[in-house]
Amino acid sequence: ESCDYPDYAHPLAKAVEAGEVYPGIAICGSGNGIAMTLNKHQGIRAALCWQEEIARLAREHNNANILVMPGRFISQEEATHTVEAFLSTPFEGGRHQRRIDKIPL
């Protein structure tokens, strides 16, 4: 059944921004629309990930605070590994923090 991803993205982003939820996890068809919507929120760094290594890099280098996965293009097994990688990987900081500090307009 079709749904409007902004109806889910905005409450999730607000919950992460408020510190009520950390990190956030979203699953959508391709993941693109919900990731774009999430990233409209100040302080949100939603990363579209479909493999473990992408999820690790999203945390290590980008300090992503919401994991977005493409439900149509990821198996349940790969989704499980991707979530585990995202949740267990710390942010490296250093030069990556400097880059993140340059994101807000």
Regions found by a protein language model. Give the residues of each.
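Alpha-helical structural signal in soluble globular domains
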Residues: 15, 37-41, 85, 102
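A general structural signal for well-ordered alpha-helical segments in protein cores
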Residues: 9, 31, 35, 79-80, ...
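Short, structured active-site "lid" loops
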Residues: 7-30
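C-terminal binding/interaction regions
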Residues: 52-105
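Short beta->alpha junction loops
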Residues: 1-5
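Mid-chain, well-packed structural core segment of small domains
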Residues: 26-72
